[in-house]
Amino acid sequence: MADSAQVPALVYLVTGGCGFLGEHIVRMLLEWEPRLRELRVFDLHLSSWLEELKTGPVQVTAIQGDVTQAHEVAAAMAGSHVVIHTAGLVDVFGKASPETIHKVNVQGTQNVIDACVQTGTRLLVYTSSMEVVGPNVKGHPFYRGNEDTPYEAIHRHPYPCSKALAEQLVLEANGRKGLRFGGRLFRAIPASVEHGRVYVGNVAWMHILVARELEQRAALMGGQVYFCYDKSPYKSYEDFNMEFLSPCGLRLIGTHPLLPYWLLVLLTALNALLQWLLRPLVLYTPLLNPYTLAVANTTFTVSTNKAQRHFGYKPLFSWEESRARTIHWVQAMEGSAW
């Protein structure tokens, strides 16, 4: 007779499971969580690759739904033991209205929390965003900071504002009716003069570890913030991107910016004005705006070992392997574009 401790019994729900991070979490759960009985993938748009996952020993259930619809979230969650909430609307260019961003990121998160209370699901891992911390509108640097580093978080852009509000909801809900909403994870994909990046596989791996350890270490991990980090080098946007683009034949020309900073500021102001004037007529979403310029020109790096101390996190992928995998992905994307 099999040891009951080894019988797969857990049901996981991953919201936004077809997104870039969500897909990595889904695939990694199937590979690394031996207690998994059913994996529910909840997303507004379901991907075709889900079908290939349905042939394995774990039941993979694809659920098309919208986090802004409370009844759909509750129905998907019923009977789940662990929820990993990655669903969200990332928009720093103004493609979506502030109201839509708030509805998805804030109300959607509230719906997930309410569904946890309604269904008795005790464990929630929430994916936040580094933009919640900064860079702020004043352009203050965040140099080798950790989860406890004082930093004046001032936001005006709808996206970081929405993620900050959503994170606050999760923090306030922790411990409510015995619930453990913990391990809020930041995706470290910020800013420029010197920036800290992290490979998506290591971000997914940290989610797996938090979800696995949260119940046993609830007193320590519940309601905590964890920056995700690995051994990726601190470099500017351009220099870091060239780590992956150089093998594809691209070269970075020059050692100084093509345009002076004051001119970039002027251009962002002009773009913001045009976006406001044209909004009633046409959707104008320039890549360069005041927010993206501030992000790209503010040092933002992380140096912490909190996740290792709390639940034994170590990067699953080395920098060399992360770089090789990313180059392969870029080359595959390049090939599919032709």
UniProtKB/Swiss-Prot annotation:
It is found in: Endoplasmic reticulum membrane. Pathway: Lipid metabolism; steroid biosynthesis. Coiled coil: none annotated. One of its GO terms (biological process) is B cell chemotaxis. Gene3D superfamilies: NAD(P)-binding Rossmann-like Domain. GO terms for molecular function: cholest-5-ene-3-beta,7-alpha-diol 3-beta-dehydrogenase activity; oxidoreductase activity, acting on the CH-OH group of donors, NAD or NADP as acceptor. Its EC number is 1.1.1.-, 1.1.1.181. The chain crosses the membrane at residues 258-278, 280-300. It catalyses: 7alpha-hydroxycholesterol + NAD(+) = 7alpha-hydroxycholest-4-en-3-one + NADH + H(+); 7alpha,25-dihydroxycholesterol + NAD(+) = 7alpha,25-dihydroxy-4-cholesten-3-one + NADH + H(+); (25R)-cholest-5-en-3beta,7alpha,26-triol + NAD(+) = (25R)-7alpha,26-dihydroxycholest-4-en-3-one + NADH + H(+); (24S)-7alpha-dihydroxycholesterol + NAD(+) = (24S)-7alpha,24-dihydroxycholest-4-en-3-one + NADH + H(+). Its main location: endoplasmic reticulum. It is an enzyme of class 1 (oxidoreductase). GO terms for cellular component: endoplasmic reticulum membrane. High levels in liver and lung, moderate levels in spleen, brain, heart, kidney, jejunum and testis. Up-regulated in 3Y1 cells upon growth arrest. It is a multi-pass membrane protein. NAD(+) binds at K163. InterPro entries: 3Beta_OHSteriod_DH/Estase, NAD(P)-bd_dom_sf, NAD(P)_dehydrat-like. Keywords: Endoplasmic reticulum, Lipid metabolism, Membrane, NAD, Oxidoreductase, Steroidogenesis, Transmembrane, Transmembrane helix. Pfam families: 3Beta_HSD. The active site is at Y159. Disulfide bonds: none annotated. PANTHER family: 3 BETA-HYDROXYSTEROID DEHYDROGENASE TYPE 7 (PTHR10366:SF847), NAD DEPENDENT EPIMERASE/DEHYDRATASE (PTHR10366). The 3-beta-HSD enzymatic system plays a crucial role in the biosynthesis of all classes of hormonal steroids. HSD VII is active against four 7-alpha-hydroxylated sterols. Does not metabolize several different C(19/21) steroids as substrates. Involved in bile acid synthesis. Plays a key role in cell positioning and movement in lymphoid tissues by mediating degradation of 7-alpha,25-dihydroxycholesterol (7-alpha,25-OHC): 7-alpha,25-OHC acts as a ligand for the G protein-coupled receptor GPR183/EBI2, a chemotactic receptor for a number of lymphoid cells. Belongs to the 3-beta-HSD family. This is 3 beta-hydroxysteroid dehydrogenase type 7. It comes from Rattus norvegicus.
